[in-house]
């Protein structure tokens, strides 16, 4: 197992990467994914980390970095290897290697349990959208 900084733009814009990352986007098409990833790649404060096991990429985490703080823009694990601690290991490994003091994320009811298991504290908020409101959670992990 290894966690690596991925700078392979071709792979990050591939259908293989999309197949992993799509689960943390709201009903994306491949074109939606590529647009978002290109936006991430154009921002020098954003880095993409990959979880790789025996040469197979099974996890991705997109972080926006600011000094010793980071915001998780998205984290996703291949469906066939979920619930094995890969997401938690991805966060832990990157936080340790970058010596992060604080990691933040915003999530929904579907994923709040994951962040709780990783040790994040949470603040429940209601976000208004044109088609209604939804519950979200601001999650924070301090070292």
Predicted regions and their residues:
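Conserved acetyl-CoA-binding loop-helix of GNAT-fold acetyltransferases
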Residues: 77, 83-96
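Conserved beta-strand in the GNAT
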Residues: 50, 56-64, 69-76
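Active-site rim helix/loop that mediates acceptor-substrate recognition in acyltransferases
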Residues: 24-53, 57
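Short glycine/proline-centered loop/turn elements that form peptide/ligand docking sites
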Residues: 87-91, 111, 127-135
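Short amphipathic alpha-helix that is part of the acyltransferase structural core
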Residues: 1-35
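Conserved catalytic-core motifs of GNAT/GCN5-like acyltransferases
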Residues: 102-106, 121-139
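Conserved active-site tyrosine of GNAT-family acetyltransferases
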Residues: 115, 120
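Conserved GNAT acetyl-CoA-binding A-motif
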Residues: 96-110
């Amino acid at each position: 197992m290894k966690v690596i900084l991925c700078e392979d733009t071709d792979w990050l814009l591939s259908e293989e990467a999309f197949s992993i990352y799509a689960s943390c986007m709201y009903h994306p098409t491949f074109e939606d994914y590529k647009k978002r990833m290109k936006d991430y790649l154009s921002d020098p404060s954003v880095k993409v980390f990959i979880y790789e096991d025996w040469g197979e990429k099974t996890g991705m985490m997109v972080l926006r970095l600011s000094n010793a703080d980071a915001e998780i823009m998205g984290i996703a694990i291949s469906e066939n290897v979920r619930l094995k601690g890969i997401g938690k290991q991805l966060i832990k490994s990157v936080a340790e290697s970058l010596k992060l003091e604080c990691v933040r994320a915003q999530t929904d009811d579907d994923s709040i349990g994951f962040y709780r298991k990783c040790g994040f504290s949470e603040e429940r908020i209601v976000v208004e959208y044109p088609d209604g409101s939804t519950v979200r959670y601001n999650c924070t992990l301090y070292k």
